[in-house]
Regions:
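N-terminal accessory nucleic-acid engagement/regulatory domains that precede
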Residues: 65-162
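Conserved RecA-like ASCE P-loop NTPase motor core of nucleic-acid helicases/translocases
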Residues: 20-28, 39-41, 45-52, 196-198, ...
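Conserved acetyl-CoA-binding loop-helix of GNAT-fold acetyltransferases
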Residues: 207-211, 460-483
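Conserved lysine of the Walker
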Residues: 32-33, 205
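N-terminal pre-P-loop "Q-motif" helix
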Residues: 2-10, 171-191
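Terminal substrate-recognition subdomain of acyl/acetyltransferases
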Residues: 248-250, 258, 270-271, 277-378, ...
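Conserved beta-hairpin
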Residues: 393-412, 419
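Conserved coupling/interface region of RecA-like P-loop/ASCE motor cores
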Residues: 125-175, 304-342
Length: 672
């Protein structure tokens, strides 16, 4: 039998059995593409090619793959030769029909560990691509253990294998499967409220939503992150399918008996909450696994707002057979199962550190930690797995009970910037990679040298639900403080809720910043807090905490949400205010960063300053101000606001203004 005959026979068998398979093609780039083209020519199908520079249609970049979720393809090629976008790879696997091949193009097998991966630029905070040895070794181990996955290496013998026959698969007929039928019955009888259907990919949740719409007595509006992702839902809903984009729906005032939200976890929480409040009955569907944000985390974070929530889960695959080899290898490679989250750890707690090398030496340990973090955090994705395995500057602590993970803490090194770079960040001229809190302390704070201090930021912390409220989280933070004795502080950035803040307060953190707009992902304002460890860290924490107290009333008015600290009634312009105001007027500091000191400046100035007063005192939008002042756009408006701030400062004290300009990065030559 020729190679083509063997390939076609194996593909026919896969179609009859309702399964999909992964073929890894590893070698030089040209050789990999030649093999992929030959297989593509031998098998009819869609053959979606996912690559930064795919040579054939239909094609898609990894970044654009999100727009195709909810669609189906027969066969696909994923080119990871330059870099492995794990989330896009997982998402692509979920779009493939039964009987499909997924071809994964990879560099020469022996170079995987040492070869720089361009995808690392998205998650490593490095200026250049870095090798990713832990992920490469993990992928090799996973592939070597799976006889259902094929590996074709350049200059190595390869033949198409034969596999024992499986039970013949009966594809879905379009009628509800038993699991779906039971949920449909419950939904039809549901009183007003919110229902969720969560499932791994391929379980028919979009089909279920469409079947429900086609059979319901009332009316329904469908919304989703992208209309292109609702093809399956639309096919089952038929002529009763009525789609509106989330923002258009919110603006329209449209009404219906039901709102159906497909892939709800991918819609920003504040927007979703507003939509949900408008309809008597809501059906939310979302994926339980991590490449779109975890469905389990979606339930934890968003659905906790609805105590009478009706929860449904689909477990049996509909679009392919159980034990599909492609689904199994993707789940194993990207750790989509959550065994550590599902099993309760009992016994005394012991806390210890582990390092990235553990992925190669004792992989069960970091795997269990990742499973716990993934189950507890709604935004954990394969990108976090890549970062956990190979990004520099990561630190990990685990709390175990009888060899089971009960809690975990993940910290990231930050700060240590040069004085020159820190000052440039403060002035708004530079934004180097990474250093989330350290940069924010400089860019949004009062100290130009804040980013020179060295800290460790809490990236993730989780305690198993069965062991919460025992102080395990506080023990992890206390242990982290001891391990970071050479640092100036620990830091954390989080979506503010009173409950979360109480936890960080109990750990010893001091609130130093509140954002001025809600996070799209959580619907909360961003809060930043420091736990000082050195004298310099204490001075910085005290200084920024005091600044926040001075600005508290203004931020409360701006945000419409109280800040949890005692406000200071100090309206006089102090040295920090003057320095920051000059940074706004003559450098690139953002307007909303300088809310407090600009408000105080307006109180002291008798000048009209219409662009500043209109934005800060009247809260007019940029568009309104541009129309009112006959300005061409936001850039011109900001330039005018900077010029008006400069005018007010010079009028108050020209000499002081000039002295501060003279010592500013760039000499204050970048006046707006």
């Amino acid at each position: 039998m020729s190679d083509i005959d063997a390939l076609q026979a194996l593909t026919s068998q896969m179609t009859q059995e309702g399964i999909r398979r992964l073929l890894v093609i590893s070698g030089d780039a040209a050789w990999c593409r030649e093999r992929a083209e030959a297989i593509r020519a031998a098998l009819p199908g869609d053959w979606l090619w996912v690559a930064p520079d795919a040579p054939a249609q239909p094609r898609c970049t990894p970044q654009a793959l999100q727009t195709l979720l909810g669609r189906e393809f027969r066969h696909a090629i994923f080119d990871a030769w330059q870099g492995f976008d794990a989330a896009a790879f997982a998402a692509l696997s979920g779009t493939l029909q039964a009987g499909s091949w997924l071809l994964l193009l990879m560099p020469p097998y022996e170079t995987w560990e040492s070869r720089p991966d361009i995808d690392s630029l998205r998650w490593s905070d490095c200026a250049q691509p870095i090798p990713t040895p832990q992920f490469a070794q993990h992928l090799k181990r996973t592939l070597s253990r799976d006889p259902q996955t094929l590996l074709w290496r350049q200059r190595q013998p390869f033949c198409w294998p034969s596999y024992p026959s499986r039970e013949r698969w009966r594809p879905a007929t379009g009628e509800p499967q038993p699991e779906q039928a039971a949920i449909l019955s419950r939904l039809r009888e549901m009183p007003p409220g919110v229902a969720t259907v969560i499932a791994p990919r391929g379980r028919g949740k979009s089909a279920l939503a469409g079947q429900f719409i086609s059979r319901m007595a009332g009316t329904a509006i469908v919304t989703a992150p992208a209309k292109t992702a609702t093809d399956i839902l639309a096919a089952f809903a038929g002529e009763r399918f009525c789609f509106m984009a989330p923002d258009a729906l919110l603006a329209s005032g449209a009404r219906a008996d039901w709102l159906v939200v497909d892939e709800a976890a991918a819609i920003p929480a504040p927007l979703l909450l507003q939509l949900v409040s408008r309809f008597p009955r809501i059906l939310l569907t979302t994926t339980v696994q991590g490449y779109e944000g975890t469905g389990r985390g979606f339930l934890l974070k968003f659905c906790a707002r609805f105590p009478q929530l009706h929860r449904f889960t689909l477990r049996q695959p509909v679009r392919w057979a159980p034990e599909c080899p492609l689904e199994n290898i993707v789940s194993e490679a990207l750790i989509f199962d959550d065994e550590a989250f599902a099993q309760a750890p009992h016994g005394a707690i012991a806390i210890s550190a582990f390092y990235q090398q553990a992925w190669g030496e004792t992989p069960a340990l970091p795997r269990a930690v990742y499973q716990l973090l993934s189950g507890a955090h709604y935004r954990t994705s394969p990108l976090d797995l890549r970062r956990m395995m190979d990004a520099p500057g990561q630190h990990f602590l685990q709390a175990t009970a009888n060899n089971r993970v009960a809690g975990a803490l993940w910290l990231v090194e930050e700060g240590g910037l040069s004085a020159e770079l820190s000052q440039a960040v403060w002035a708004g001229f530079r934004r180097p990679r990474g250093n989330l809190v350290a940069q924010s302390l400089a860019a949004h704070g009062s100290d130009p040298l804040a980013a020179t201090l060295v800290g460790r930021r809490v990236s993730r912390i989780a305690v198993h639900p069965a062991r919460q409220r025992e102080g395990i989280g506080q023990q992890l933070i206390a242990c982290a403080c001891m391990q970071a004795a050479q640092c100036d502080y620990l830091s954390v950035s989080f979506g503010y809720t009173p409950e979360l803040w109480r936890f960080w307060q109990r750990c010893g953190f001091v609130l130093v910043r509140m954002g001025n707009h809600r996070e799209a992902s959580s619907g909360c304002y961003t809060a930043m807090a420091l736990l000082p460890l050195s004298d310099a860290g204490k001075r910085l924490a005290q200084q920024e905490h005091r600044r926040l107290r001075r600005d508290a009333d203004i931020l409360t008015q701006w945000n419409g949400e109280a800040i949890p600290l005692a406000a200071l009634d100090e309206q006089a312009l102090n040295d920090e205010d003057w320095r920051e105001l000059v940074g706004f007027a003559f450098a690139h500091r953002p307007l909303l960063t300088s809310l407090g000191c600009l408000h105080r400046l307006l109180q002291y100035s008798a000048l009209p300053l219409p662009a500043l007063r209109g934005r800060l005192e009247e809260k007019a939008s940029d568009a309104e101000l541009c129309a009112r002042l006959r300005i061409s756009g936001r850039k011109a408006l900001l330039a005018l606001q900077r010029a008006q701030a400069a005018q007010a400062l010079i009028t108050l004290d020209a000499g002081r203004t000039q002295r501060l300009r003279d010592v500013m990065p760039g000499g204050g030559d970048h006046a707006g």
